[in-house]
Amino acid sequence: MVALLAEHTDTRQQAGLLVRPDNSDALSVAVTATPIVTTTGTPATPPALELDVQHGDGVSKRNGLPSRKQIEKWVKSALYADAALTVRFVDETEGRTLNRSYRGKDYATNVLTFAYAENDDDPVAGDIVLCCPVVESEAKAQKKSLEAHYAHLIVHGVLHAQGYEHDDDTEAEEMEAIETETLQALGFEDPYKPIRE
């Protein structure tokens, strides 16, 4: 058995592969494929999303929380496969407890992602936990809107849920490039550009 894989960089055209040996007694094989992505690089059929939005104790009354519609739009913009995700907004106590329990760091951080896929064949599933007081403080310090910062951190979390990491410079550059492109497509500025004075 022979397996052949052809990648076509021009998503506007069909990819084709033809194997025709010099020997006229041999079999010719032709393979064509219809593009599965649009010219913008997004899937032709959007991935299915099962989304649960949760609010920890006392968090639902905070100002500036994104709506479910916004969250769904941001999640889908960074999604490359069908997924079941929970986006949870928490206070500093819950954020700190989770960070200490799962990462051994005794402080609240802006976003934590818990990805449940054990290998590449597993469906995308995960929890994205945002600590509201930290997100609010960072947005103010970075002179960006709270909406833009929530969008960035949700996109960041969705990428983590799909296996993206930033443990070294190469991974960080790749992930940041995807985040920047995704957020700009949503109408936000580059989240990594230097802070305005």
Swiss-Prot record:
UniProt feature coiled coil, ranges: none
Its EC number(s): 3.1.-.-
Keyword vocabulary terms for this entry: Cytoplasm, Endonuclease, Hydrolase, Metal-binding, Nuclease, Ribosome biogenesis, rRNA processing, Zinc
Keyword Thylakoid belongs to the record: no
S-adenosyl-L-methionine is among the record's keywords: no
PROSITE patterns associated with the record: UPF0054
SUPFAM superfamilies with a match to the protein in the record: Metalloproteases ('zincins'), catalytic domain
Sequence positions that bind Zn(2+): H156, H160, H166
Localization in the cell: Cytoplasm
InterPro entries for this protein: MetalPrtase_cat_dom_sf_prd (IPR023091), YbeY (IPR002036), YbeY_CS (IPR020549)
A Pfam family recorded for this sequence: YbeY
Gene Ontology molecular function: metalloendopeptidase activity; RNA endonuclease activity; zinc ion binding
Cofactor: Zn(2+)
GO CC terms of this entry: cytoplasm
Cofactor note: Binds 1 zinc ion.
Residue spans crossing the bilayer: none
EC top class, as a word: hydrolase
Gene Ontology process terms (BP): rRNA processing
Classification via Gene3D superfamilies: Metalloproteases ('zincins'), catalytic domain (3.40.390.30)
PANTHER family in the record: ENDORIBONUCLEASE YBEY, CHLOROPLASTIC (PTHR46986:SF1)
Role description: Single strand-specific metallo-endoribonuclease involved in late-stage 70S ribosome quality control and in maturation of the 3' terminus of the 16S rRNA.
Protein name: Endoribonuclease YbeY
Species: Cupriavidus metallidurans (strain ATCC 43123 / DSM 2839 / NBRC 102507 / CH34)
